[in-house]
Amino acid sequence: QMAVSYSREELGRGISLTRIYDKKFKSNCVKIAFISPLDEKTACVNAMLQTVLVTSNAEIPSRTKLTSTLTGLYGSSIGTNCGTIGDYQSVGLSASFIGDDYTIDGEVISVQVVRQLLNCLIRPHLVEGKFCEKYFTLRKQELIDAIVATVNDKRGYALLQAKKVIFEGEPAAVSAIGTVELAENITQEDLLRQHKKLLESA
């Protein structure tokens, strides 16, 4: 029987650290999640914001180079998390990487991967005070495509419609990624404002 350890520590008001350890796994996953009340426009902005943040950062302002750097660290990756929990939305960033015990000569890659994860969150790639326009446009179109794709996913679409009926008039009825119209109207200012708000109060 494998021993699984679990601990949860309060680091500050509204901030907690959860550790789950199971020695049967050879890889690690670090997730940073922001929980905030569900609101259709905010949910849409959050859904796009997280994808823009993981594209690059101030230290590595190139999407290709960031991907290459992580791949060079034993196939590590940085991604996003987006979903709903009742009347709340959970969005954030995550990093997956092999455990340091399994690298060649015990190379410590965990610190390097988590450094880039934190860079993406706290030191985003800004050009003259705004997110890189190229990546902004790219991620906006990807979000629109994802929203459109939900209509073609019969099971997912049916679940979304059921939620709208069951939770009519309640935050839980809202989609975790918003609508095409809302996505099309997201501005740079929306992302910058929401990024600041998440760090300060989510």
Predicted regions and their residues:
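Acidic/histidine-enriched alpha-helical segments
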Residues: 67, 123-147
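Charge/polar-rich, low-complexity and marginally structured segments
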Residues: 151-154
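Histidine-acidic residue clusters that define the catalytic metal-binding segment
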Residues: 3-6, 161-201
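M16 family metallopeptidases and their MPP-like homologs
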Residues: 26-44, 64-119, 156-178, 202
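His/Glu-rich zincin catalytic helix
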Residues: 1-73, 192-202
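Catalytic micro-motifs at enzyme active sites that drive phosphoryl/nucleotidyl and oxygen chemistry
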Residues: 79-83, 148, 192-194
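Short, polar/flexible loop-turn hinges at active-site or ligand-entry regions and domain interfaces
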Residues: 56-59, 101-104, 123-133
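Structured segments of extracytoplasmic/periplasmic soluble domains
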Residues: 52-55, 73, 116, 120-124, ...
